[in-house]
Regions:
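Positively charged n-region of N-terminal signal peptides that target proteins for export
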Residues: 1-4
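Acidic helix-start/capping segments at beta-turn-to-alpha-helix junctions
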Residues: 88-107
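Bacterial N-terminal signal peptides
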Residues: 7-16
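Surface-exposed, polar/charged faces of alpha-helical domains
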Residues: 62, 84, 88-91
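Acidic/histidine-rich, surface-exposed loop or edge segments in extracytoplasmic proteins
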Residues: 48-64
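Histidine-anchored nucleotide/phosphate-binding helix
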Residues: 68-87
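Boundary at the C-terminal end of the N-terminal hydrophobic targeting segment
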Residues: 16-23
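N-terminal targeting signals for Sec/Tat export/insertion, comprising classic cleavable signal peptides
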Residues: 30-53
Length: 112
């Protein structure tokens, strides 16, 4: 087994620190308050107030146990991010296609 020099690991540890510190900048809302957290982004070009979004999300991989499906959370994040940027919620239309192992993320044993 190869041993890694601490000198090699130091830059990796330095990169991980800012990433974890940035997580505190993420917040949920304005549409979904329990998931779909976003971080503020400095926009160089504002989004048009009448912009229409029609996006499809393909969800086939099951979530980790006791966690929300990452792709479904990405869809919630997409909505939160754009509404926070000023796009009216009524102008955002998502199709979330769920199949394969991800189908189990939509049900629970209590459902049956």
């Amino acid at each position: 087994m190869r041993k890694f020099s601490p000198v090699i690991l130091l830059p990796l540890m330095a990169l991980a620190q800012p990433a974890s510190a940035q997580m505190e900048n993420f917040k949920t809302g304005p549409v979904f308050n329990d998931f779909g957290a976003t971080a503020p982004v400095q926009m160089t070009e504002p989004l048009a107030k009448d912009a229409q979004f029609k996006i499809a999300f393909d969800v086939s991989t099951a979530a980790d146990p006791d966690k929300i499906n990452r792709t479904i959370e990405s869809a919630a994040r997409f909505i939160n991010m754009h509404v926070a940027a000023g796009v009216p919620e009524k102008n955002i239309h998502l199709a979330i296609v769920v199949h394969g192992g991800a189908a189990f993320d939509l049900t629970s044993p209590e459902f049956f």
